[in-house]
A protein has these predicted regions:
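Acidic, metal-coordinating catalytic segment for phosphate/diphosphate chemistry
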Residues: 1-13, 27-30
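HhH-family (HhH-GPD) DNA N-glycosylase catalytic core used in base-excision repair
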Residues: 2, 33, 72, 114, ...
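Conserved Nudix-box catalytic region and its N-terminal flanking loop in Nudix hydrolases
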Residues: 21-73
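Short loop/turn microsegments at loop-to-beta-strand junctions
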Residues: 11-12, 66-67, 123
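Helix N-cap/coil-helix junction residues
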Residues: 80-81, 138
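Active-site-adjacent beta-strand/loop module that shapes the phosphate/pyrophosphate-binding cleft
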Residues: 82-85, 90-115
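NUDIX/MutT-family hydrolases
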Residues: 106-108, 117-149
Length: 157
């Protein structure tokens, strides 16, 4: 497959905290990347979705705050939840089994409202402490991201 090396998918993920526990979800076996593995809510940018937003420039198509828009949309779609203001945790790049590179921006946010209601992309969920999350078959790096959020929360007091 000849891919333009400059092109990447862009994805966002959100570690959602509620009462000292974090939402983890199990990916459907039909997913292209990491089927059956545990993760946190998130997903890829889809141009047709943010193009529905009003452009912030009269001269050309341009949109501000698209990362937060996509993050909130993915959390709502995958888990049925609303979140507080998301905060940046880290980023990474991985290459999917089909050869496409994905830039992932990881955030955390406190649960604001709603009860977990999974969509077709996820098959199970759990609210787990960082220690409890170690017992799940998490995608590489998710445990470390959860532990980073625990450190951030401790620093915030």
């Amino acid at each position: 497959m000849d891919l333009d090396p400059r092109l990447h998918f862009v994805a966002v993920t959100c570690i959602i905290e509620k009462g000292g526990k974090f939402l983890i979800t199990k990916r459907s076996l039909n997913e292209k990347a990491f089927p059956g593995k545990w993760t946190v809510p998130g997903g890829k940018f889809v141009r047709s979705e943010y193009e529905k937003l009003p452009s912030t420039s009269p001269l050309y198509p341009q949109w501000y705050n698209v990362v937060e828009f996509v993050l909130r949309k993915e959390v709502r779609e995958e888990a049925g939840l609303e979140i507080e203001k998301p905060e940046y945790v880290t980023d990474l790049v991985f290459v999917r089994p089909d050869g496409y590179p994905v830039v992932t921006l990881s955030f955390w946010a406190r649960h604001k409202s709603g009860e977990v209601k999974l969509n077709h992309e996820m098959s199970e969920f759990a609210w787990a402490t960082a220690e409890e999350a170690k017992r799940y078959d998490l995608i590489d790096g998710i445990q470390e991201e959860i532990e980073e959020v625990v450190k951030l929360l401790k620093r915030q007091g």
